[in-house]
């Protein structure tokens, strides 16, 4: 069970975007893309076959999953634990004990 999923509200713990909060857009094997975090400028060539124009575009780049933490109701970063009740696994915040994404 993944501890961080698409749609979760996270905060960046390390790096140039430390302290920024955003929503997880995608989860890859060990990386996540977070809305508005780690934005890079990419040069795109024009493609007349597709009708796209060239130029410099902003692209959201993935960051390692260990560099983000879920945000609790108080806006503080929290680790995530797994709780099993009746054979059903649920994600639980370590700081408050509240269930995540219920």
From Swiss-Prot:
Q: Sum up the protein's function in the record's words.
A: One of two assembly initiator proteins, it binds directly to the 5'-end of the 23S rRNA, where it nucleates assembly of the 50S subunit. One of the proteins that surrounds the polypeptide exit tunnel on the outside of the subunit.
- Molecular function via GO: rRNA binding; structural constituent of ribosome
Q: Which domain of life is it from?
A: Bacteria
- Which family does the similarity line name? Belongs to the universal ribosomal protein uL24 family.
A Gene Ontology cellular component where this protein is annotated is: ribonucleoprotein complex
Subunit structure comment from the entry = Part of the 50S ribosomal subunit.
UniProt xrefs under InterPro entries = KOW, Rib_uL2_dom2, Ribosomal_uL24, Ribosomal_uL24_KOW, Translation_prot_SH3-like_sf
Q: Which UniProt keywords apply?
A: Ribonucleoprotein, Ribosomal protein, RNA-binding, rRNA-binding
Q: List the disulfide bonds.
A: none
Q: Which NCBIfam families match?
A: rplX_bact
Q: Name one Pfam family in it.
A: ribosomal_L24
Tell me one GO biological process term: translation
Q: What is the name attached to this protein's record?
A: Large ribosomal subunit protein uL24
Primary gene name: rplX
């Amino acid at each position: 069970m993944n501890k961080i999923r698409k749609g979760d509200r996270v905060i960046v713990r390390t790096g140039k975007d430390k302290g920024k909060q955003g929503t997880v857009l995608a989860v890859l094997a060990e990386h996540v893309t977070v809305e508005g975090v780690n934005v890079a400028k990419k040069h795109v060539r024009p493609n007349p076959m597709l009708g796209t124009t060239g130029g410099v575009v902003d692209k959201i780049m993935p960051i390692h999953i260990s560099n983000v933490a879920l945000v609790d109701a108080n806006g503080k970063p929290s680790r995530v634990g797994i709780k099993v009740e009746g054979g059903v696994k649920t994600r639980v915040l370590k700081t408050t004990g509240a269930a995540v994404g219920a």
